[in-house]
From Swiss-Prot:
Residues holding Ca(2+) 1: 206, 208, 210, 212, 217
Enzyme Commission identifier(s): 3.6.5.-
InterPro entries referenced in this protein's UniProt entry, alphabetically: EF-hand-dom_pair (IPR011992), EF_Hand_1_Ca_BS (IPR018247), EF_hand_assoc_1 (IPR013566), EF_hand_assoc_2 (IPR013567), EF_hand_dom (IPR002048), Miro (IPR021181), Miro-EF-hand_domain (IPR052266), MIRO_dom (IPR020860)
Residues engaged in binding GTP 2: 461-468, 498-502, 567-570
Ranges of the Mitochondrial intermembrane topological domain: 656-665
A biological-process GO annotation: mitochondrion organization
One Gene Ontology molecular-function label: calcium ion binding
Membrane topology: Single-pass type IV membrane protein
Organism per entry: Yarrowia lipolytica (strain CLIB 122 / E 150)
Pfam family membership, one: EF_assoc_2
Transmembrane portions of the chain: 635-655
Identification of the protein by name: Mitochondrial Rho GTPase 1
Amino acid sequence: MTNDVIRIVVCGDEGVGKSSLITSLIKDTYVPNIQKLLPPITIPKGFSSSPDAPLSTVIVDTQFSNSPAEAEHLHREIRQANVIWLVYSDHYSCERVSIFWLPYFRNLGVNLPIVLCANVFDDVDSWNSRDSERIISDEMIPILREFKEIESCIRVSAKLNHNINQAFYLCQKAVMHPIAPLFDAKEGKLKPNAVAALQRVFFLSDRDQDGYLSDQEMLELQVKCFGRSFDATDLIQIRAQLAKINPALATERGVSEEGFITLNRLYADKGRHETTWGILRTFHYTDYLSLSDQFLYPKLDVPENSSVELSPEGYRFLVDLFLLFDKDNDGGLNDSELKTLFKPTPGIPQKWLDFNFPYTTVHDEQGSITLQGWLALWSMTTFLDYKTTMAYLAYLGFEGDNSKKRFSGSSVTVAMTTAAAAAARLTAFKVTKPKKRRSRPRPYYRATPNDRSVFNCFVLGSHMSGKTSLLEAFLNRPLMTDIYKPTIRPVSVVNSVEMTGGKQCYMVMEELGQQEAAVLSNAARLEECDVICYTYDSSDPNSFSYIDGLRRKYPVLDTLPCVFVALKADNDRQQQRFDLQPDEYTKQIRIAAPLHVSSKWPSSVTELFIQLAEAAQQPGRGLPNQDPEEETNTIMPFALAGGATVLLAAAVAWIFKNVRVAGRE
């Protein structure tokens, strides 16, 4: 519930007992002589025994008049209300409910829940008579069917002080636990948004993903949502009730998803929808059956020039998810398993589809995403758009320590507030230190990043130089055809790279296609790039000149580390029609000679990706036109300072020793 204060406006014809009802509620007894119109009354939280009660409830008494001023006052009060307590007392005022009052509320344009109250029974004997059922059937049910804004109806007596507290609770309940978002009374079934929300609750509660909530899982859900356990008889009754409707809803394995939905439909149908709301709010749903932006996207402070990566906790959660949904234990998630995994989410992330999923990362021969590819995809998504990962972790139920218990088999019996759950999700991420630049006579260049494990590489080169083949080789896939197809849209792939010494990082490689000029002119996009892979076709004499043209057109590229690569090295090498041959060219700009690579030589491909990763991690070594000593020169002042300190300390020690010797003599 988002209302800290509930405002109840009491409406009805003159003389139906509105003021008497309010007085009896406050005094807990009937007061015969009261003023015609009571002032607004504030009732504190402690007045109600419900743990979900608002901080305060304001009850506003009203009267209807043809006076323009009083009519405007009534309009204003109704527009400020959270719920309307509509009272009638006899046949005439009952007729006025459907003829005047309910159309009047609609004409005002308000969409408020209404509690219909019959304040007519002052004879004690009448409460137990059959007339009671007849009155409900004849008077109230037709109105309920015609006007869906009526949440509930109740018979009360101000004189006997009967059912007034219950009527007040129904008004609070109409705001705290509204039936309208959940249940379609005319159709007698839950609304689609309610079904979707409950399906997500079922998904997150079905810890072993067998399609049923076992007794243990039902108990854990009950304790998590309401802080108390079921009795054994309660579970038996629930199962029996569902099995009576359809045996498939509750079997020996537990309650099925359809059975769980049916159970909540029964709650709503019987006026126990506060139970359903208790479940939904535990899983952070708003009154509109959505997950709020505050929950999906908690604030994460990311300094300028910093990036966001997954933390060990985030990777662990994603590994656990992969293993849970790899039902056939073949080491890959097929289409069916992916569909099941993403069921509680909006679907496969749009970012993945934009990058031509599933061809963006590593998959097996059957097209199933491997664990390596799964983690690489999320690493790329987090690096490029961490808010997407943040939202999907929310949909999939990441809650810090609670997530560890969920996969380890421990009971998850502590519900987290929406704010706490959002804050716990931040533990799935780490923010890297801001990218720094070192100054030198030429343009700035980036300092060595020492806390990053995800890097971005732009693959640049002439048409037909082999860029697409290189990206396919990065994913350990052969090129499907030798027929050249120009890359139109940008293509991104991601995979892990194991470097010398066993350290692993993730590399996102982008071929820019026809958007190359736009990307290279965009400072923000260039800031995302950590290393450039300049490619040329070693068997095409006109291929290399394209690289020099790019560097001249976009001088800013020289502020990024780069690796030159001669592709198609298995073909006969041709002299390049350019002023300098590639080896001479790279020597002139003081970087390593081109690496000769062929997709038919796996070891050469592996070596290239290692060099790209190392260039991204140590950008000073791959920058064009840098003197060899410049990278080490940045350390020299500290080394000299350290050496001077050591010499000074030695000199002081020598002087101190000689002074002591002289003193003794």
